[in-house]
């Protein structure tokens, strides 16, 4: 029975409890308050377990689903938890990311007219520089012509869908085969449904700390990054300044890319026998997918 506007799934594993004070804390500070928070434990340590239990005692909206370590990322545990969800919509947050205060409210509005939606995110780099990323330009019903956009990948934290649509999926969250990205594998199920009506929003509502930007970073180092940014997103003025800085980063990167492309076109480098300027889109797409795995 639907009694909440949103259920938020927060997967966590190992000894990452120190991050939850910040990631879950950003959920607790959402402008939309009628929510429930499901923390999905995938082999957490005793220390992390105590941290999660403490969070639950302080906020009755939090529920903890404690499981042993799964062979992948505990995907079936998410499915089990969603059988008990009471939210009209389902949102997600990686335990290393932060929600801007309006994220769930934004998703709630989008998922009134659509049943699958994504926002963009503010990409935080290792040097603390900012960018805006992951606008995939996907609108309307799922179709074969838009399949590539789904394959481009949407991160967990900036994706949401209705609970009703989830219950129409053939499988729901399930163990991801080796060499597949967990999120892309899951979102492809939504794409397979004729009733999937998706929307890509341009507004950044997540602060995203990509694992690849912080190679080998310890939990303590990640905690420092979250501690640095979490207080900054509690004021509207600061958030607007952060967005402006991220937009500047996006424009700067685009300009650098244009300069790079001009220089590359002047070289004699061949890619699979093609001049760089004439490389087929399929090869470039494959290269993009491989780079994302780094």
Across the structure, where does each feature detected by a protein language model lie?
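Boundary detector for helix-to-coil junctions that initiate low-complexity/charged tails
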Residues: 243-294
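Nucleotide-sugar donor-binding/catalytic module of glycosyltransferases
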Residues: 1-255, 262
């Amino acid at each position: 029975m639907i009694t909440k506007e949103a259920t938020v799934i927060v997967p966590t594993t190992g000894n990452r409890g120190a991050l939850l004070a910040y990631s879950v804390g950003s959920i607790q500070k959402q402008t939309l308050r009628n929510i429930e928070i499901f923390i999905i434990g995938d082999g957490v340590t005793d220390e992390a377990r105590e941290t999660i239990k403490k969070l639950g005692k302080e906020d009755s909206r939090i529920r903890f689903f404690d499981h042993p370590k799964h062979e992948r990322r505990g995907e079936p545990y998410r499915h089990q938890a969603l059988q008990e969800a009471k939210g009209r919509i389902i949102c997600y947050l990686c335990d290393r990311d932060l929600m801007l205060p309006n994220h769930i409210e934004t998703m709630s509005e989008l998922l009134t007219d659509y049943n699958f939606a994504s926002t963009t995110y503010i990409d935080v780099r290792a040097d603390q520089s900012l960018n805006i990323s992951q606008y995939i330009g996907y609108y309307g019903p799922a179709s074969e012509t838009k399949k590539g956009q789904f394959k481009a990948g949407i991160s967990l934290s900036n994706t949401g869908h209705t609970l009703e649509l989830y219950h129409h999926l053939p499988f729901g969250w399930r163990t991801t085969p080796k060499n597949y990205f967990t999120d892309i594998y899951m979102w492809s199920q939504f794409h397979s449904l004729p009733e999937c009506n998706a929307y890509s929003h341009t507004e950044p509502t997540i602060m995203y700390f990509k694992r690849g930007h912080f190679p080998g970073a310890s939990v303590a180092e990640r905690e420092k990054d979250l501690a640095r940014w979490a207080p900054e997103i509690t004021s509207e003025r600061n958030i607007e300044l952060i967005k402006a800085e991220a937009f500047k980063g996006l424009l700067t990167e685009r300009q650098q890319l244009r300069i790079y492309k001009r220089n590359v076109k002047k070289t004699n480098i061949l890619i699979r026998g093609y001049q760089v300027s004439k490389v087929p889109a399929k090869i470039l797409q494959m290269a993009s997918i491989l780079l994302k795995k780094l």
